[in-house]
Structures are given as C-alpha cells and as structure tokens.
A protein has these predicted regions:
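P-loop NTPase motor domains
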Residues: 1-88, 103
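Conserved ATP-driven motor cores of ASCE-family P-loop NTPases powering translocation/secretion/packaging/pilus
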Residues: 80-128
C-alpha cells in the first residue's frame, strides 16, 4: 500500500460508512481494531477543534458492536465524555456490563455514567435489571 486507502481524515466531512470487521473466534488482531479506534477518536477530535471550531460538519456515529471483544481503547473513559460536543457519538453494544468492568475496571462506571441512554434486552445480571 503506497497511499492512504482509508482516508480516515475525511470522516466528519461527508456521509461515509466505515466497517471494521474482526473475527469473533480469533482475537489475535483485535489490538489493531483497538488502536485504529483510538487513533480515529483522537484524529476526529483534533479535526473538529482545528478545522471546524469544535464541531464536525457531519455527525460521526460509532456503532461499537461486541465492544468488549475489541480490547481496551486507551483513554476511552475520557473520550466518551468529550466527543459529544464535537458532533460524535458512540453506541457501545455488550453482551453484559460485566464485560465492560472486566476490561475497563474502575473506568467502566465512568463510561456507563456518560451514556445518554441504556437499552437492556434481557440477561441474567440481576443487579443491572434495576437500572
């Protein structure tokens, strides 16, 4: 690859869909998705601040299915609290909130606190059923 095929820096300029697909049976390269997500959040925050007075012209929505299987995104607890003002949002999709706690430890509660809404589709976590 001799040139940038992803053009991540154009996200937020126009409507675009980017699909990051990983194996659900082999986690060898999950760290690549985690690094890419981290870089993407940072790139778009910087772009919003530097080029668009703090807000991207086109809202960027991250649909993070199987979020626990991506691995830990560095500083995600801080990012999730600040991206909203820059016209970005993240939908974190988990099988159970315990997965989030296993990966993010104490920061899991901060991540949950910064979620505007929670959709619970059933499960056996009795403690979360009372939310």
């Amino acid at each position: 690859m001799s040139y940038d095929e992803l053009e991540l820096d154009t996200l937020g300029d126009r409507k675009t869909a980017l699909f990051l697909i990983m194996s659900d049976t082999d986690d060898t390269f999950n760290f690549v998705i985690s690094i890419l997500q981290s870089q993407l959040f940072n790139l778009l925050c910087d772009k919003a601040d530097d080029e668009y007075n703090g807000k991207l012209p086109v809202h960027v929505r991250f649909l993070l299915d199987e979020f626990a299987n991506i691995g830990q995104i560095p500083r995600f607890d801080k990012l999730i609290a600040t991206i909203r003002s820059r016209e970005m949002s993240a939908s974190i999709i988990l099988q159970s909130q315990s997965q989030l706690k296993a990966i993010y430890k104490d920061a899991a509660e901060i991540i949950l606190d910064n979620a505007d809404s929670t959709l619970f589709l059933g499960g056996r976590e009795i403690g979360r059923a009372h939310v």
